[in-house]
Each structure stands twice: as C-alpha cells, then as structure tokens.
C-alpha cells in the first residue's frame, strides 16, 4: 500500500471512531490493512509530532537512560505501550540510533497491532531485538506513550500510572486539544514528585496552567510539517480528502526522567505556550516559567528581529526574557531551535 492507493474505507472508519470516542470501547483494528493505511497517513502525522519533541530533547541535551537488569547488566530499552502501528517506538529508536538500544518492546490491546508494529520494527531495524513484552518483566527503561489518554477508562488510566512509576523515563505525546492537554498536565502533577520534569516545562514547580483562573488555557505546541506535506500531491490529496489541515500539527507532551541531571539546566528560561498573537506594532503571548503563567507583550520597536523571528520559529519557543513588568524588551536566546 502507498499514499496513491489508500484504503479509504478503513481510514474513514478509523477517523470516525477517533472523533466520536468509539475507539475507547475496545480494539478497533480489523486487519493488517487497517494498520498499514493508518501508518502511512494518520500515523505519519503523529510521527511529525514525535520528530518535533525529539529535536527539542536533543536541544536540551537529553538522552535515554540505561537501567540495570536482575544480573546487573546496564541496558537501554524502549516500551511502546499502546503501540498501534508502532510509529512512536520506531521514531524514538531511529532518532537515538537503534544500535543504542538492546530491545524495543511493544504492547497493545490488539494482537493484530502488536504483530504489525513488530514486523515494521524488525524491517526498519534488523539488528534490534523486538521481544514479546511481559507485564511482570524487568524494570522498564524508556516508556513511550502516544495518543492513549482519550481511550482509557479511569481504571485503565490508574493502571497505566502504576506502570509509569516503574519506568526510568517517560516520553508521552497527546493531541493538542484542550481536554487532552489538561489531562496530561494533571498527570504531570501526579508524577512530578517522583520524576524530574525534562520538558516541555522549564521548571519543576506546580503547573501554572492548573491554577485557578486558567481553566480555559492549555499547554500545547505546534510541530512543523515536512516539506512533502505541501509538495507531494498525494499528501495534499490526503489532507483534502480527510479534512485535515496539514499546515497545523498541534500536540501536547511530557518528558520525565528519574535522573535530576538528565538534561541541560533550564533555570531562568521561559516558554511560550501555543503561538504569539500579532497586532499592529506589538504581539502578545502566554508565558510559562517557574513563577507561573502570565500574559506578556512585546513591542516591535523594542526588538524588530525577535518580533519577526517569533512568527517564523519552527522549534521550541524557549527564551530567557528581559522584562519590564509584563513587557518583554529583549531576550538572551537560550535553546530555541530551528525545528529543522
């Protein structure tokens, strides 16, 4: 199967389930054909979110941890929980190098999905072990979670957090919707006493977006689509047929690690939530730092180059501001990246 001959009957059924919540009622993969069509399209779009998160983690100096086995051997492993077609686990393994991992474990409530994901991983990484994962197996190294929250009942969510507490590190991506993002923010609060928050936050304090009065705000970001999303006619046709704006790829995410020195220090840094809003001669944005969240503004005349850059920046919007009250007057560029 390719983008030219997609199974639209399967894609329409899957998208309808995702949009109307029926995906939470049990396995929705009916065949390997379903998974192949999904992996090429919706799964690949999720992969763009993973690309953005992984680039940010590289900018922050983070690498996956090694964990000790029962025999004392240090190993780096990935557990892609709720793997679906396996795009998340493959993206992580490819980014850090499959040679740096001893195993990629897969779990899904659908045996069909696990089989597809394992086959795809073995094809992509012939020398990487993809053994069957057992819930009672040795400690979890890197736990990878992708678009699972809105498919979990309260009981299943609680069970997942029990599993998460066994991990050495967690990379978790969800859609950039208000509901999914705030649900992930709440999980951050539940786990931050046991893990070091690597990203998206620049601090270890309580989430400012969960403070009273911030109920309408949510922590979301935008991944830059690859050039082929605009230049490949098959992607253009897919976006039109599926009713998806491929220019906008919103997501929320959480990166946690038990190591307190897992990434470069981020004290004093701020993060722009979402995108700045431009007006004539000035802009406004929602800022997050260790003191909480606040609406800040910047006048074009104070820093014309930065004013223009903030509209074009494709990487994480992480800066060290110089402020007069709620007005940004300039910045020391910290680890904002190009997103390429």
Language-model features: where?
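Conserved class I S-adenosyl-L-methionine
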Residues: 74-84
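Conserved SAM-binding loop of SAM-dependent methyltransferases across substrates and taxa
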Residues: 85-99
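Conserved beta-strand signature within the Rossmann-like core of class I S-adenosyl-L-methionine
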Residues: 167-176
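N-terminal auxiliary segments of SAM/dcSAM-dependent transferases
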Residues: 1-25
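C-terminal lobe and adjacent flexible extensions of AdoMet/dcAdoMet transferase-like proteins
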Residues: 236-340
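A short SAM/SAH-binding and catalytic strip from SAM-dependent methyltransferases
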Residues: 141-155
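Class I SAM-dependent methyltransferase Rossmann-like catalytic core
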Residues: 26-60
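Conserved SAM/SAH-binding beta-strand->alpha-helix loop
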Residues: 110
